[in-house]
Amino acid sequence: MKKLFVLEGPDCSGKSTLARALQKKTNGVIFHASGNKLLWPVMHEYHQSIIDNAFAVLEHHDVIIDRLWLSELVYHRVLRPHLERRYQWELLDAQIRGKQGLYIACYPDPGIYARYEKNIDPSHPYDMETFKRICTGYLIELMTMHPRNDRFEYSVNFYNNSVDLAVKQILTLW
C-alpha cells in the first residue's frame, strides 16, 4: 500500500525541506498547496482538487502534500476574517483519514523568524507582525483543536532535529 503524508506548519518551519527529503527516500510525488490571493474565494475547491489528484497518484506512488486544511484554518483567521468561511476542513480530513494519511506537524522553532526575514516567499509577503500571528495561530490550533494530537501522528521541530532523522522516524511509523 502506498503512503500518504500531509505536512502542516507555517512558512519556514521545514515543510518543503521535509517534503523533498521524503520524496527522495520514497520516490513519492509532492503536491504543494499555495495560498495565492486569487484562490481565496475557492480555497475548498482548490484543496479538493489537490486531494483528488493526490489520490489518483496514490494508486502508484507515495504522496506528500505540503500543507492543506490546517493551514487554511490559520491563514483564514489571520488574513481574511472578513471573508465568509466556506471551507469544510472536516470533509477534507475525513478523505485523508480514509486513505490512512499520516499528518505531520512542523512546529515553529526559535529560528523561524530569522529564516522568514531571510527567505520571504513572494507569494506570502507578510510583515513580521502578521507572520508572528500566523505562527501563534498554528500553535493555538495544534494545542487546542488537537490537544491529544489525535490527528497529527508525528510532530517535528527542526531546531533540534535533522531532516534525515525526522524522515527515518516518520518512515518507521509505517
Where are these regions (language model features)?
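Residue-level preference for the first positions of well-ordered beta-strands
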Residues: K2-L4, D62-I64
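Class I (Rossmann-like) S-adenosyl-L-methionine-dependent methyltransferase catalytic domain
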Residues: L4, L68, Y116-P122, Y126
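Hydrophobic anchor at the beta1->P-loop junction of P-loop NTPases
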Residues: L7
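Conserved substrate/cofactor phosphate-moiety recognition/catalytic segment
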Residues: P10-S13, T17-D62, V74
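Short, solvent-exposed loop/turn segments at secondary-structure junctions
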Residues: P10-S13, W69-S71, P108-G111, V163
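Conserved phosphate-donor/acceptor-positioning beta-strand/loop module used by diverse small-molecule
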Residues: I65-R67, R85-E117
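A mobile, often basic/glycine-rich helix-loop segment
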Residues: L73-L91
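NTP-dependent small-molecule kinase module
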Residues: I120-W174
